[in-house]
């Protein structure tokens, strides 16, 4: 008589069924962990963004509030808005341009940077509290 050293078909089906049950339980659990991690990451990003905005406007004596972040369907940020007292500051971003509209007495206080047209190594923005004007570090107001 031949000595068989293997699993029967029934044993293999039982093992596959057990693995399928474990996978059916484990996959939603892991998906839940990923969702929680993404939400925590988003919350930390927004907190960091709000802190950076508050620090950038700390010397103005104006209250920063109402942070709103708009994203496209893929989660890419397209617009950031916040209130500086009653004035709205808007940072709009597209594929090849970023437009910052800063608080001022008129709507002309706006700077657009177009990556397709402008050669940009670095741009440092500063705010002169005496003249109440923004400058881009290149002598442009």
Language model: regions and residue ranges:
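Generic N-terminal leader/processing signal
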Residues: 2-3, 34-37, 107-108, 115
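N-terminal single-pass transmembrane signal-anchor helix
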Residues: 3-31
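Generic N-terminal initiation segments characterized by hydrophobic and/or small/turn-forming residues
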Residues: 6-9, 30, 46, 64, ...
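Aliphatic-rich helix starts adjacent to a transmembrane/signal segment
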Residues: 29-51
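Periplasmic/extracellular, small/polar-rich flexible segments of pilin-like filament-forming proteins
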Residues: 51-141
């Amino acid at each position: 008589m031949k000595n068989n050293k293997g699993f029967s078909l029934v044993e293999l089906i039982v093992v596959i069924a057990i693995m399928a049950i474990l996978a059916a339980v484990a996959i939603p659990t892991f998906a839940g962990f990923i969702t929680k991690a993404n939400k925590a990451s988003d919350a930390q990003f927004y907190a960091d963004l709000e802190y950076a905005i508050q620090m950038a406007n700390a010397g103005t004596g104006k209250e920063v509030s109402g942070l709103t972040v708009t994203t496209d369907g893929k989660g890419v940020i397209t617009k950031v808005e916040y209130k500086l007292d009653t004035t709205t500051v808007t940072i709009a971003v597209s594929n090849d341009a970023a437009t910052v509209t800063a608080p001022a007495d008129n709507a002309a206080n706006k700077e657009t940077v177009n990556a397709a047209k402008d050669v940009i190594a670095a741009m440092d923005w500063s705010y002169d509290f005496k003249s109440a004007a923004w400058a881009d570090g290149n002598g442009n107001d």
